[in-house]
Amino acid sequence: MEIRHRGVAAVAVLATVLGAAGCGTDSGATGSRSTGSAGEEGRPKGSAASLTWEFEHIADFDGELADVAVLAKDDIWAVGTENNGDSHARLLHYDGTQWKREPLPEALGDTVYPPLLEEVGDKALWLRPQNSGDGAAANRWAQWDGTRWSAMPSPPPGKVGDFEAAGPDDVWALDGEQTAQHWDGTRWTATRLPYGASDLAVVGPDDVWAVGSRSTGPGTEMEGQGKEYDQPASMHWDGTSWKAVDTPQARFKEPIPPEASAGLGQVFALDNGEVRAYGTNSFNHGEVEDEPADEFIRLRWDGSKWVEQQGAPGGCATRTPVGQDDKGLFLDGNWYLTDDGRCVKIKRHRLPVSTGARKASNQSLWLKEIHRVPGTDEWLGAGHVQVNQSGDPFSAPVVVRLKRGG
């Protein structure tokens, strides 16, 4: 999804597969794509050539972590799910000395799904339910004041999707597909979006972007298929209202495959204010022979219009950004793109055998979220390691820390 200007990145999914031995950089089951010989584009020289996710914490239950919030080196929160026949939400906290399980705040009520952690300012944290379809639970939020959890007195109405905070008095949230809610520190205000949106990026108080798709207007006409050809859509908030922004169309050549549609699923604001958007032009696969390949959409706002963004090399070609540090971009799938355009695969370790993972097991690391530790260039990630082995597969919730060099 998009970077937040406090150095917080929201990650849809980061996946990488560990082989049966070593920490290698194999990409066999990752879905990542590579070009050229032996990956010279993915193995640059210099300090960026060696990045590794190392285990910071391995939880003592079968399950996964779904979110993490890093308020300080000694104040880290993680939420996840324990799989013990029935799924149970779990809350973990690190106080600088050890990780401990904490009870979920009573303000949330009963919940099976792990809640989501939202950093809204300096050491300010909100805990909200997932959009699970339960209207009553959707409005039960909790807030952390540095000492205790309490009920949030004014949660946003509706069922919140994407959530972006530039500060405790400047918060945006998607409510359904075509409504945006804004918190000014006192109250929530709803505004109507021109089109359906799936993602938000906050550049500044009067500079907010939303992206999604539209089913009306130029490029949506499609003869003989009984439906519209959805097109990429983008919208901009200028401090007064949301306005539709002209967005390049995407369309397969004739014959158009079944149920073709195009849209933007991610908008990302760099630290320098540059805005990028990503999406796909796809269709319902398996209905015709000689199918075309899905098309990857990558756009950059040049200050007045959207222009096509140059593709990255090697395994970074179809990856989207999930975070930014001082030297480049973290991409989904555990890839890293340096500022000078080099593509690096982030390495990873295998679980120790003490966890029950056998030496011959197949292990895959899935990260749901990465965060910069405030005031540092250290990064933490949260997710799980899936261990596939005969008779005793399991999932280990993990927090990982990025190691540079060595």
List each language-model region with its residue ranges.
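Residue-level hotspots at or immediately adjacent to binding/recognition sites across diverse folds
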Residues: 24-406
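Secretory targeting and sorting signals
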Residues: 1-36
